[in-house]
Amino acid sequence: GLFDVVKGVLKGVGKNVAGSLLEQLKCKLSGGC
């Protein structure tokens, strides 16, 4: 139902946020920012 859709969207957003945070961390560690 609707709750499943919302949960799926939140999971997708969470994955995107985690991915971008990891990218920023890698960037800082490699000094390439």
UniProtKB/Swiss-Prot annotation:
One cellular component term from this protein's GO annotations in UniProt: extracellular region
Tissue-wise, where is it found?
Answer: Expressed by the skin glands.
Keywords, A to Z, come to: Amphibian defense peptide, Antibiotic, Antimicrobial, Disulfide bond, Secreted
Source species of the chain: Rana dybowskii (Dybovsky's frog)
The protein's superkingdom reads: Eukaryota
The answer on whether this UniProt entry bears the keyword Ubl conjugation reads: no
Q: Listed disulfide bonds for this chain?
A: 27-33
Q: Which InterPro entries does the UniProt record give? A: Antimicrobial_frog_2
Give compartment(s): Secreted
Protein family: Belongs to the frog skin active peptide (FSAP) family. Brevinin subfamily.
Show the Pfam families listed in the entry: Antimicrobial_2
Q: What is this protein called?
A: Brevinin-2DYc
Describe its function: Antimicrobial peptide. A mixture of Brevinin-2DYc/2DYd is active against the Gram-positive bacterium S.aureus (MIC=15 uM) and the Gram-negative bacterium E.coli (MIC=15 uM).
Q: Does the keyword Secreted apply?
A: yes
Instruction: Give the UniProt record's GO annotations in the biological process aspect.
Output: defense response to bacterium
